[in-house]
């Protein structure tokens, strides 16, 4: 399982923080973190693909709907903590349950208290910056691969599988 401390990653890295809007006093239903969360979901989905069961945990306090149900987007489970509960405690609880069940867990957060709490056998800890570095490296590698492919000419025979 991959557990991501959502707002910690957003606040700790310019990649996502730059996507956050200023809160608007004229609109109570404006969500300043919508774009940042959407990009984070896409990045986590790409990072986790085929390797992890990804979960992003957000603090529910202060959200427009503090009783949000668990959601899923692009194969990533989104969990908002309940009113009065922190995302940190949700992450700690999920990591403890996974570890007790003998499953490996990777926790992404730059919160040192969370990192210390989830430390133990079967738990890998990565900083928020490490996730962003991995995502940006993957994007760069994909761009290079795409550019390399676009420079070569392909014939119909090149596109056919040898078994055909």
Task: Provide a role label for each language-model segment.
Residues 2-4, 8-164:
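Nuclease catalytic cores that cleave nucleic-acid phosphodiester bonds
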């Amino acid at each position: 399982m991959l557990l991501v401390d959502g707002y910690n990653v957003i606040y700790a890295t310019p990649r996502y923080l730059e996507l956050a809007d200023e809160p608007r006093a004229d609109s109570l239903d404006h969500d300043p973190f919508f774009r940042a969360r959407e990009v984070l979901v896409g990045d986590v989905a790409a990072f986790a693909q085929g390797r992890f069961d990804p979960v992003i945990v957000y603090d529910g306090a202060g959200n427009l709907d503090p009783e949000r149900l668990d959601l899923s987007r692009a194969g990533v489970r989104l969990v908002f903590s309940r009113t009065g509960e922190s995302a940190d405690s949700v992450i700690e609880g999920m990591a403890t349950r996974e570890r007790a069940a003998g499953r490996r867990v990777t926790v992404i957060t730059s919160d040192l208290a969370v990192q210390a709490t989830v430390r133990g056998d079967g738990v890998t800890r990565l900083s928020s910056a490490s996730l962003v570095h991995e995502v940006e490296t993957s994007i760069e590698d994909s761009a290079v691969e795409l550019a390399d492919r676009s420079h070569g000419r392909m014939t119909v025979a090149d596109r056919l599988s040898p078994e055909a």
